[in-house]
Amino acid sequence: MVSKMNNIQSSGEISQHKAAKIAGIIFPISIIILMVVNLTVVAPLIIKSNPSETARNISSHEFLFRIGIAGNILYSVCEVVFLIALYTILKNVNHSFAIFAAICFMINSFSWLLIAINQFTVIRLLNDIGFSHSFRPEGLFAMVRLHLIGEDIYYIGLLFWALGCTVISCLLLKSRYIPKSLSVFGIISSAWCAGCTFIFYIFPNYANVINLWWFDSPMVLFELAMSIWFLIKGIKTQQPEPA
């Protein structure tokens, strides 16, 4: 009986170590995908002050725009893999909180699917002759611009991402799977992101006080550092405290 219990525990530890390696690989990849497709592929096509020029850019570079859509979908898939890996690592620390964090990450992942769906709608609006006959050019361009406003969806997802990351950081602090200082930085940066995002919902001009890049950049740096630690150092499964 004791031998069987030891085998089960050993199997669980192996799963956690594998999950840590997966998390260490998948998050940096997902961030690279997200940054490349949105900052270097999609962003140059969108001119916020000129919807008609934006529509022409997308029509002329539809292949690039579709690469951006595919990248957002791939990022969403990577996020699901990442949250499963984190849940596997932390479920023995506190199952309920690990589930909550996974749900938060799932909502963030879903937000990127919504952005991708809106981008597909843009292509449909521009390519379907029926739409060009139903709307005046100004109206069609306005519809295109409306579906390209992914910031609102992003910042809704960001709040849940930050909440999930805050919980993850607390569980990592409790488990001591990573250095205490790194866990504390994760708690502070994630709570900061959640707070800034929520204030931004109510006071849009808050972005004039705190640059939007400062909302999530510290949290992303934490997750990158955590991922590198998982990949290089792994986790010490003998140390976590019972929930």
Predicted features and spans:
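Hydrophobic, aromatic-enriched alpha-helical segments typical of multi-pass transmembrane helices
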Residues: V2-A243
